[in-house]
Curated annotation (Swiss-Prot):
Gene: FCPC
Protein topology in the membrane: Multi-pass membrane protein
Similarity-based family: Belongs to the fucoxanthin chlorophyll protein family.
Pfam families from the UniProt entry: Chloroa_b-bind
Protein name, per record: Fucoxanthin-chlorophyll a-c binding protein C, chloroplastic
Record-annotated membrane-spanning stretches: 73-94, 113-133, 174-196
GO MF annotation, one: chlorophyll binding
């Protein structure tokens, strides 16, 4: 865990280091994704590693799918962390030895959960990956659209501009949640709470 803290400190320090001469990407290549969802102020289209410098739309869509998925998971993780920090825990015990859910720490839980519980978690994640968090029907309107013709929640009642804004909001909140859950993890390892006591 100390390694994770040190790595995050190095990454933070690297953000303020002088820029190195990186491989130049042409303006035309960057323009291919300049109007895509997520190219928003203050950064605009941001690809410092040149992952989509070749203008490959399929690669861009795959990376966007991964970003949306991790953003959604991070939003759930932040809410889960805050709920646990507020003292809300499941009642009862997690195993036959009598260990209660309240005794299990937040991020150190993987060391405390019985092997059978971890197998259940991995199975559940596999079910989500294979049958829920993907476009099964081929009817997706955009990358990350997992409605699969089953649920809508009124999405189709919005005009195209409102849908674009809502997708941009989700993407930004997912990005913020990824940074937020990382901050919670680092501060827990440091023994410092980000939340008021």
């Amino acid at each position: 865990m100390k390694t994770a803290v040190i790595a995050s400190l190095i990454a933070g320090a690297a953000a303020f280091a002088p820029a190195k001469n990186a491989a130049r990407t042409s303006v035309a290549t960057n323009m291919a994704f300049e109007d895509e969802l997520g190219a928003q102020p203050p950064l605009g289209f941001f690809d410092p590693l040149g992952l989509v410098a070749d203008g490959d739309q399929e690669k861009f869509d795959r990376l966007r799918y991964v970003e949306i998925k991790h953003g959604r998971i991070s939003m759930l993780a932040v809410v889960g962390y805050l709920v646990q920090e507020a003292g809300v825990r499941l009642p009862g015990t997690i195993d036959y030895s009598g260990k209660t859910f309240a005794e299990i720490p937040k991020f150190a839980a993987f060391k405390e959960i019985p092997a059978g519980g971890l197998v259940q978690l991995l199975f559940f994640i596999g079910v989500l990956e294979s049958s829920v968090m993907r476009d099964l029907t081929g009817e997706a309107e955009f990358v990350g659209d997992f409605r699969n013709g089953a649920i809508d929640f009124g999405w189709d009642t919005f005009d195209e501009e409102t849908q674009f804004k809502k997708r941009a909001i989700e993407l930004n909140q997912g990005r913020a949640a990824q940074m937020g859950i990382l901050a919670f993890m680092v501060h827990e390892q440091l023994g410092v709470s980000l939340l008021p006591q």
